[in-house]
Amino acid sequence: MPRPPPPPPPGRGAPGARRPMREFFAAWLSTLRSPLLPLLRRALSSSSSSSSGGWDDPLSSAAAAVEAHFQAHWSALDAAARQDPAQAVSAGDWRSPLELPFLWVGDLHPSLVTSLLRSLSPSPRLLAATDRVDRRIRAAVPSISDRLRRVQEAFISAEVSGAADVEAFLEELKDVALDANRLRRGVLSELVAAAGGYQAALFLEALSRFVLSMHDPEVLRRFDQCRASPGS
């Protein structure tokens, strides 16, 4: 199954070659919404839970295309971090208001991915693999968060003394963003590999639905209504 070409990477490159992250992300969501998610759903409906999961069958090909699409998203965030590190570690203007509570260092918290997999009632073997990934996340997230905090504190102290090095500060922010995206990429790859076949496809379908739901107009309308009438 041929994969659709990825949208051009974000950044400040030559006109026509690159575009703002807002435009990239809109195109990325559009491709996930169609054709990738419908192709995956059709492959799931025509397969069974006993699918062998060979990477040449339609189900595995559709799942691999969705996984590659998420990996391309994090690669795009890496490219954005090299162009504008401050934006890469914050909530970009392309994010929906519903996404904001779930963000960590510029994108979804990796623990959301393992929580999503747990909600699918995985087998004991897959649950054990998820536990291992969770332990890795619990070790890495505080380390990256502490590093970001130390970078911020060092810049504040240097600014007060009149010796702030903006270039070094941005370089550190870039490295933090790259490490966070590396963790996200590894978490998804490890979980997909552990699940395999039909379970991996179910997991990627659920992840796609979750991401798209945060940009669904009806969901956002209800979210805005709740914000407009707190406590009702």
Swiss-Prot record:
Disruption phenotype: Absence of entire pollen aperture, leading to male sterility. GO terms for molecular function: sequence-specific DNA binding. This is Protein INAPERTURATE POLLEN 1 homolog. Pfam families: DOG1. Keywords: Cytoplasm. PANTHER family: DOG1 DOMAIN-CONTAINING PROTEIN, PROTEIN INAPERTURATE POLLEN1. The keyword Amino-acid biosynthesis does not apply. Interacts with LECRKS7/DAF1. GO terms for cellular component: cytoplasm; pollen aperture. It comes from the Eukaryota. It is found in: Cytoplasm. Required for pollen aperture formation, male fertility and LECRKS7/DAF1 function. Seems to be involved in operculum protrusion. Participates in the modification of plasma membrane at future aperture sites, possibly by creating close contact between the plasma membrane and callose wall to prevent primexine formation and sporopollenin deposition. One of its GO terms (biological process) is pollen development.
